[in-house]
Amino acid sequence: MHLRHLFSPRLRGSLLLGSLLVASSFSTLAAEDMLRKAVGKGAYEMAWSQQENALWLATSQSRKLDKGGVVYRLDPVTLEITQAIHNDLKPFGATINAATQTLWFGNTINSAVTAIDAKTGDVKGRLVLDARKRTEEVRPLQPRELVADAATNTIYISGVGKESAIWVVDGETIKLKTTIENTGKMSTGLALDSKAQRLYTTNADGEFITIDTASNKILSRKKLLDDGKEHFFINLSLDTAGHRAFITDSKATEVLVVDTRNGNILAKIAAPASLAVLYNPTRNEAYVTHRQAGQVSVIDAKTYNVVKTFDTPTYPNSLALSADGKTLYVSVKQKSTREQEATQPDDVIRIAL
């Protein structure tokens, strides 16, 4: 199913000029540690495609002026916009199925998910995940994180609420296969070990939950810290070979490292309150965004020491990594409130590792 009418045509620039600019500037850019470019308002998550050699950024645009949002396709070297896909629903979360080259975007406000062909920019379909109408008593679950299992063409989406769930979507038919219930309060974090058939989620109850993707049943749930303090384990990223999960906490000044086989804590890494986390197996490093501190930390995953910190004001948000593990991308938000929106677009930063 194609829903092309929901989107405007792609932006087309001069390919020849673009090629010349990339060729002339590549050596200079490659030598720089950091490149920063303004892209669009409401920048959230990113997806990277080795096959398309492109980076996509989900943006929600203005709260007041724009009904929908825009997915930008960026040149991964220059960060120049090469395509703009206008969506009538605002996109927030993002992932890609590398096998099918399908982009998946969570439409948080509308409790939906949209699938887009990475090569053409055409919409392949859309699925409403929670059709309940919002009232004072009813709060539909909102999609947050998305992960794609390329082996089975299955998309897992965390549905966040007072009592969260995980939606399991067939990537071929774009239909709901099943819903994994009872994943706790504000269960945002989501990570997949496809070979082991294990899905992991974390929540504001301080739990680390293990799910069998063969049966879509919860195998175990463990409260990681019993220290009487508030914890919100907001995101996690896996070292599948080492059976480790790196877990961020938006309520505490530390990053946890957990053994995925038993939920035991392997390390507590001192760091500012954190948001996104991404493990890099090529360099055996983990990268963490610290929204309030305006920084990105580089953690040596062997020693568990913070070995480098990048200043990325104002609010570093999400992370993406090139397939070779040599380039890190960071989406950065400007200061904005409901009363006073940001006047400038949000940025994407390219860091040579």
Curated annotation (Swiss-Prot):
Please provide the record's keywords in A-Z order. Answer: Signal
Q: Which Pfam families match?
A: YNCE (PF21783)
Q: Which InterPro entries match?
A: Haem_d1_sf, Host-pathogen_enzymatic-act, WD40/YVTN_repeat-like_dom_sf, YNCE-like_beta-prop
Q: What is this protein called?
A: Uncharacterized protein YncE
Q: Does the keyword Signal apply?
A: yes
- Can you tell which superkingdom this protein's organism belongs to? Bacteria
The stretch of residues making up the signal peptide is 1-30
